[in-house]
Design a protein with these regions (language model features):
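Conserved glycine-rich beta-strand-loop-beta hairpin in the small C-terminal domain of fold type I
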Residues: 12, 176-187, 198-212
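Structural signature of PLP-dependent enzymes
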Residues: 141-145, 165-187
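Active-site PLP attachment segment
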Residues: 104-139
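Active-site C-terminal subdomain of aminotransferase-like
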Residues: 137-155
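Conserved core of the PLP fold type I
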Residues: 1-79, 84, 91-92, 97-105, ...
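Conserved PLP-binding active-site segment of the aspartate aminotransferase-like
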Residues: 132, 210-215, 232-270
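Domain-scale detector for complete catalytic domains at protein termini or as standalone homologs
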Residues: 20, 42, 111, 125, ...
């Protein structure tokens, strides 16, 4: 393809960064704004690619508006470049109208679309998929025998049947309804028990919320407090600094009827740090 430069969202998903670095790509970090990646900061006059999470940016939860989706397509067309659209968890959007994927708006074959069933089904089924532009599809077909297929055919056929019978969409509706209630419970508990210097960032989609805390205390103490309550958390290094810590709380693992109590206990412990 003649591409050796990849633009990545900052903050972003670090395993993707490692993958591109291992493949010897040069990396261009581009800040994430309130409306998604800063399109004006993308490289111009050079063929490249950009990796984005438009439906639920990791880890900020920012959703790219429709206008920006058209704008990034314009950038790709003007610079003979590609957009890698990782649409993970796009089905798990709880509030507001669903937005069209960048791929569905693409008239110039500039989008590589990635999706996965890991979050919407369960992690044991490692089934993902990729929709390539025609030009790249031909390159892929010529090279695919050099790589092994990690997903079993039995699982793929089972999933195909599951979807053909409408079971998948029924499961998504049920999961979306449950997680909508869980997210609502989290935001209500946050409003009830929050303390000065703590801020909730993303409240529209996904399986986690991101919390920003104004503190110089070691983030490991916050993580350890959550772990003792059996809350799965993670630290967002790219957003954090010496006076501000950013932590993700995966509320999807917390029983609905326990969320209020657990958030209350967690915040009481954090106040003591």
């Amino acid at each position: 393809t003649g591409i050796n430069l990849i633009s990545l969202e900052k903050p972003g998903y670090n395993p993707v960064r490692s993958m591109f670095l291992d493949a010897a790509f040069n990396i261009c970090d581009v800040d994430v704004l309130d409306n998604g990646i800063n399109i004006n900061a993308l490289p111009n006059n050079i063929k490249s690619a950009v990796y984005v999470n438009p439906s639920n940016q990791f880890p900020t939860g920012v959703v790219m508006p429709a206008a920006n989706r058209y704008e990034i397509l314009k950038w790709a067309d003007n610079n003979d470049s590609y957009i890698i659209e990782d649409d993970y968890n796009s089905e798990l959007r709880y509030f507001g109208k669903p937005l069209p994927t960048i791929k569905s708006l693409d008239k110039k074959d500039r989008v590589i679309y990635l999706g996965s069933f890991t979050s919407t089904l369960f992690a044991a089924i490692k089934i993902s998929y990729m929709v390539l532009p025609d030009e790249l599809s031909k390159i892929f077909d010529n090279n695919r025998n050099n790589y092994s297929q990690a997903c079993s055919k039995a699982e793929q056929l089972t999933l195909a049947y599951y979807m053909s019978q409408g079971y998948y969409y029924t499961a998504i509706r049920k999961k979306r309804a449950l997680f909508t209630k869980k997210l609502k419970a989290v935001t209500e508990a946050f409003d009830k028990y929050k303390y000065e210097g703590i801020e909730l960032l993303n409240t529209n989609s996904g399986l986690f919320v991101t919390i920003k805390i104004n503190t110089s205390t070691d983030e490991k103490l916050y993580i350890d407090s959550a772990k003792k309550l059996k809350i799965f958390t993670d630290y967002v290094e790219d957003i954090s600094n010496s006076t501000q810590k950013c932590i993700m709380i995966y509320y999807s693992y917390i029983p609905l009827n326990s969320i209020d109590l657990i958030i209350n206990i967690l915040f009481n412990k954090w106040r003591l740090l």
